[in-house]
């Protein structure tokens, strides 16, 4: 019977029942009772921790990239691209009995609602920098050319921000020529 609980996502914490030992009914009722303490088994999602089943998994890592390309009107490269990237890593806890994410308190215990049911949690994404945002970029100055965007504003980034490519196009400035006879 205990294996059914373990297969359902619980883990054995303690027991006064000695597994593998033969027990027989006793007239002393106390000898017929055993205390087995089970708790919900948890899966810790931490792709940076070698002990986590998520270790090294790309499913829990997202990288958001912004590339600013500098081109002439004909599409050829005018200046080296500016690339910025921010990496996000997901963390969470899954209750093996339900297969759902749960919330833990500061002591590592599952937080429950007024009906003693676990409060459903989610993955928490953390950026590899304190303030996840792309920096403002001033377009390079090219002699004889004008950029259609003199700068690209900075923007906040989340794990759900799509990658983006911004194209800055340089147009040749009009030139005056004086012809002398």
Per-region residue spans from a language model:
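Surface-exposed interfaces of beta-sheet-rich extracellular modules
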Residues: 1-27, 107-157
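Conserved beta-strand and immediately adjacent loop positions that scaffold enzyme active sites
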Residues: 2, 67, 100, 108, ...
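Short loop/beta submotifs within extracellular cysteine-rich repeat domains
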Residues: 11-14, 43-47, 73-79, 145-148, ...
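Conserved "repeat-terminator" motif of extracellular CCP/Sushi domains
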Residues: 20-65, 70-71, 154-181
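A short, flexible low-complexity segment enriched in Lys/Arg and Gly/Pro that occurs
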Residues: 68, 76, 119-120
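Acidic/polar residues at beta-strand termini and the immediately following turn/coil
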Residues: 72, 93-100, 104-105, 113, ...
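Short, ordered, surface-exposed loop/turn motifs in non-cytosolic proteins
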Residues: 74-98
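Acidic, serine/threonine/proline-rich low-complexity intrinsically disordered regions
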Residues: 80, 97, 105, 130-133
């Amino acid at each position: 019977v205990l294996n059914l609980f373990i297969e359902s996502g619980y883990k054995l914490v303690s027991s006064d029942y000695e597994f593998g030992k033969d027990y027989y009914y006793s007239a002393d009722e106390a000898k017929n009772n055993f205390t087995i303490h089970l708790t919900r088994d948890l899966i810790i999602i931490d792709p940076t921790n070698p002990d986590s089943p998520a270790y090294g998994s790309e499913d829990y890592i997202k990288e958001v990239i912004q590339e600013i390309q500098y081109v002439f009107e004909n599409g050829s490269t005018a200046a080296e691209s500016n690339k910025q990237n921010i990496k996000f890593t997901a963390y969470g806890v899954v209750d093996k009995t339900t297969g759902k994410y749960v919330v833990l308190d500061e002591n590592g215990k599952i937080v429950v609602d007024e009906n003693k049911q676990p409060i459903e949690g989610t993955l928490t994404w953390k950026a590899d920098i304190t303030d996840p945002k792309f920096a403002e970029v001033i377009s390079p100055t090219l002699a004889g050319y004008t950029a259609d965007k003199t700068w690209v504003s900075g923007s906040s980034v989340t794990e759900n921000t799509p990658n983006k490519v911004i194209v800055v196009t340089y147009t040749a400035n009009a030139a005056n020529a004086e012809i002398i006879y």
